[in-house]
Amino acid sequence: EMLVFREHAQHHVHAKDNPDDWANIPGWAIASWNDRGPGVSELSAIELERGKSGDRLWDSAQTGLFRHGTMHNNVRMTWGKAFAGWREDAEEAMHLALEMNDRFALDGRDPSSIAGVQWCFGLFDRAFGPVDPIMGKVRKRPTHVHVNRIDMTAYEELTNKATMGVSMDIGVVGGGLSGMFAARLLSDLGHNVTVWDKGSRIGGRLTGWKTDDGTE
């Protein structure tokens, strides 16, 4: 995998004007995705980004991704395929998976990373039967099966660690837009954050101005 798949991905990306385009997915897979019926349970992008899908394995993998920038390749195969169950449009699901990977992963936008996510939607693969309601003919990797192959308690301990390995107590002075953004980011990364602000309302002075009649 280190030799063959890496070189395969490098050549694939080199040969494409738009390596992350949906048109790179093989025709049989696109046809299979188009034949899917309704029934997926859509979650918002922010819920998925913050690891709030409700799926124990997926949420742990996503938390590790945005806190540490890493995800084991075998887990990423399962992580990437799960997006298909949260979007009616498989193309949208693939681009959302690529966006998350590109934004948070240390190897985001790397050829192996791009091809790895697209593999989840049929790239470099063949059709499988029987047809699945969610994945169609594309290879399945359900999280409820994968979770039985690993020590989930140990995996969660690894991925839930705060960035830099230790949770710090951090104070942010100023509850304006920048202060709240910094506090939210540090909290997402596993640190204990306290915000101090002299204002009477959350959000600092930029959140609104009161007029004489009390409206904002």
Language-model segments: residues:
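Gly/Thr-rich phosphate-binding loop signature of adenosyl cofactor/nucleotide-binding cores
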Residues: E1-M71, G136
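A short, basic/flexible loop-to-alpha-helix module at the beginning of a structural domain
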Residues: T163-M168
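C-terminal, helix-dominated tail/subdomain
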Residues: W22-P38, L43-L48, A93-E157
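Structured ligand/cofactor/substrate-binding pocket environments in proteins
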Residues: L3-Q10, F66-A115
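Glycine-rich FAD pyrophosphate-binding loop
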Residues: G171-V173, S187-D212
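Glycine-rich Rossmann-fold phosphate-binding loop(s) that bind the pyrophosphate
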Residues: G174-S178
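Catalytic cores of glycan-processing enzymes that make or break glycosidic bonds
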Residues: E1, K16, N73, K81-A82, ...
